[in-house]
């Protein structure tokens, strides 16, 4: 049985330092996976800095449990928040706070045999100060159970 794994992932994508100067400094993630960070899909890699510590365990044969906690901050305070694929969903409007929010993610996978497997993924987004200060804000929960049959 595999040993437990502890990991960390970090992402940095540029934001626009000076709005209205005729130059766009915001990273453009062409063809990005909407759920690149979590099922919550509240942001995309444009003007985002994030850190994701994670932990994976294999308690029994065929069962994998993966957990992560992600911290999201705007890279540049003068730029807003973007959602997939790259829509500006919240303008900066002079707000200096950078904390967008945190996401707790959980994935439980169980492979019964080489043909049948089950997967349960969930994520819980906790709104940060920028979300709260820039408009409507609420925490969001997503869950996606799946069963796969390969032949």
Please report, for each region that a protein language model flagged, where it lies by residue.
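Repeated loop/turn-to-beta-strand initiation elements of outer-membrane beta-barrel proteins
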Residues: 3-6, 62-65, 110, 114-120
């Amino acid at each position: 049985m595999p040993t437990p794994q502890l990991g960390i992932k970090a992402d940095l994508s540029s934001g626009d330092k000076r709005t209205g100067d005729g130059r766009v400094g915001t990273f453009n993630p062409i063809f990005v996976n909407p759920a690149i960070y979590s099922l919550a899909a509240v942001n995309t890699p444009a003007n985002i800095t994030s850190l994701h510590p994670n932990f994976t365990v294999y308690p029994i044969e065929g069962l994998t449990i993966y957990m992560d906690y992600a911290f999201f901050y705007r890279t540049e305070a003068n730029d807003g928040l973007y959602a997939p694929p790259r829509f500006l969903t919240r303008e900066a409007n002079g707000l200096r706070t950078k904390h967008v929010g945190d996401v707790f993610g959980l994935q439980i996978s169980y492979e019964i045999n080489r043909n049948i497997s089950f997967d349960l993924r969930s994520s819980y987004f906790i709104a940060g100060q920028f979300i709260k200060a820039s408009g409507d804000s609420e925490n969001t929960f997503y869950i996606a159970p799946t069963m796969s049959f390969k032949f």
